From Swiss-Prot:
It is a peripheral membrane protein. This is High frequency lysogenization protein HflD homolog. Keywords: Cell inner membrane, Cell membrane, Cytoplasm, Membrane. Belongs to the HflD family.
């Protein structure tokens, strides 16, 4: 895949979208359905033809692109999103250095793909199976991501499944970010360029 500013912006918007949806789901128990579907589908796109193919099309990343443009500020909402972002990228770095973990992740995603021949991806059991990949493969690499939200919402099993599935989608986008050449220096020194690129993409969708 190409290592361009466009590709890095798309991948980073994917991480932003996952973090934003986790925040919304944890507080309200629901989030934008199309964006959620895009996030879950991205997990299964293990051999994409290009960066955008992971998400279907640019417009499927509208929430993530808007989130990137707004940037992360010092408000409680902004700092929480930043914490999720940093945590997801830190977990992906641990995963990248863990060959067994990458192998297990691939196997478990393959199992999900086979199960989808018989079940709908929105079934509670399927979402539970996707969430269990995060619990079994990603979470033990630590440190755990502390998700904050409405306690009564977070206690619901279906919300827990969806939050963990979204966190897994964030890891998938973080893997993509690394694959297209994304590095920490791009976040420190190239943030303004990514914001400008995100604005261009948003204007075209």
């Amino acid at each position: 895949m190409a290592n361009t500013l466009f590709d890095r912006t798309i991948a980073f918007a994917g991480i932003c979208q996952a973090a934003s949806l986790v925040q919304k789901m944890a507080k309200d128990g629901h989030c934008d359905q199309e964006a959620f579907d895009t996030a879950i589908q991205s997990i299964l796109e293990t051999n994409p033809s290009n960066t955008v193919a992971v998400y279907g099309k640019e417009s499927n990343l509208r929430i993530g692109l808007e989130c990137l443009v707004r940037d992360f500020d010092n408000t409680p909402s902004g700092s929480e999103l930043t914490r999720y972002l940093i945590s997801l990228m830190a977990l992906e770095r641990k995963l990248a250095g863990h060959r067994d973990g990458m192998s297990k992740l691939g196997e478990r995603i393959g199992t999900i793909e086979r199960q989808l021949e018989h079940f709908d991806i929105h079934d509670e059991q399927m979402l539970s199976n996707i969430a269990s990949i995060y619990l079994d493969v990603i979470s033990p690499m630590g440190p755990r991501i502390q998700v904050t939200g409405t306690p009564s919402v977070l206690q619901q099993p279906m919300t827990q499944h969806k939050v963990r599935a979204l966190l897994l989608s964030g890891i998938r986008s973080a893997v993509l970010w690394r694959q297209v050449g994304g590095k920490r220096r791009h976040l420190i020194f190239g943030r303004k360029k990514m914001v400008e690129q995100a604005k261009i993409i948003l204007a075209q969708i």
